[in-house]
């Protein structure tokens, strides 16, 4: 019996919404993107619940099980290091000092979570799409 295919989720925590996408092992989108309220001002636990809701909607729409998600890419609108938020930025005060990466990974059954800030995520995404045409990329955001 062959192993079921694995998928990866991308979750973008914004000031008002969480935007999410599911991709296959080749990086091709599977199903539709999902957007839910982020609830960042209500605290990180409220947002973790919204992230899980987005994952459930993504997997349900694609007809896959959550245990088929091999990894999650998570971006946050704040500076962080090693998964720990170190400045409030667009988040509520309870985010500062929180290891978002590890806590969210624990909530979703130990699935690896790879986290960066939203600016780095935007640059990495643009580079991934355009690297066939350009050798370098400079991203300037307002």
Labelled PLM ranges:
Residues 24, 36, 61, 128-139:
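Bacterial carbohydrate/catabolite-sensing allosteric modules
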Residues 51-61:
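Alpha-helical scaffold within the catalytic cores of cyclic-nucleotide enzymes
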Residues 14, 75-76:
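A secondary-structure boundary/capping signal
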Residues 2-49, 53, 85-87:
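Short glycine-rich, Thr/Ser-proximal phosphate-binding strand/loop in the N-terminal lobe
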Residues 10, 116, 139:
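Generic enzyme active-site microenvironment
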Residues 44-52, 67-72, 78-136:
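Glycine-rich phosphate-binding loop and adjoining helix at the ATP-binding site
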Residues 25, 118, 142:
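Cofactor-binding loop segments of dinucleotide-utilizing enzymes, especially the Rossmann-like FAD-
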């Amino acid at each position: 019996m062959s192993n079921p295919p694995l998928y990866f989720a991308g979750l973008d925590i914004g000031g008002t919404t969480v935007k999410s996408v599911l991709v296959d092992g080749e990086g091709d989108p599977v199903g539709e993107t999902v957007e839910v309220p982020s609830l960042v001002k209500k605290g990180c636990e409220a947002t973790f619940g919204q992230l899980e809701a987005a994952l459930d909607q993504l997997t349900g729409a694609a007809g896959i099980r959550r245990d088929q998600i091999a990894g999650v890419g998570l971006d946050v609108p704040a500076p962080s290091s090693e998964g720990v938020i170190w400045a409030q930025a667009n988040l509520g005060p309870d985010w500062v000092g929180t290891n978002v990466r590890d806590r969210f990974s624990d909530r979703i059954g130990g699935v690896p979570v790879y986290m960066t800030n939203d600016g780095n995520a935007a640059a990495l995404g643009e580079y991934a799409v355009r690297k066939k045409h350009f050798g370098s990329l400079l991203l300037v955001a307002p």
